[in-house]
Amino acid sequence: MRRNRGLKKIKTSVEDLKVIHSGKKIRLMFQDEAGFGRINRPKYCWCEKRIRPSVPCHHIREYRYAYGAVEPLTGDGYFLVMPYCNTVCMNIFLKKLSERFPDDIILLCCDGAAWHKSGGLELPENIILFHIPPYTPEMNPIEQIWKEIRKRGFRNEVLKK
């Protein structure tokens, strides 16, 4: 019963948005950040029997963070690489996302990271933020994108400066 009340509330909110912002497209987008760094984790690879493969590895802790938002229904998305995960970088990402879809209302679903709930967060007029429950990454489709990028793009790679 409780689950149905939540769904009715969301449906009512979307209907209200359609009335308030008539004529504008409403996009449901999912947002997340992923850290990519120079510290690699060797993965499995194929080789001949009795040969141990050599995979270069180093332990330099330099990271870049990919901020991304994707709309699962259309496949539209926006990604931005930033030096940190904090409120300042999140504000820049939100501003750029707003500029990318200026004529649309964006319902942006985020996880519960501190910079998503910060008092210093500046929301553009066309972005409405809401959060998924804690510890539920399976509810955020963009997590699959990060998983695929890590699997295909950075396996057994040493990134140079």
Where are these regions (language model features)?
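Short functional hotspots at interaction and active-site rims
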Residues: 1-161
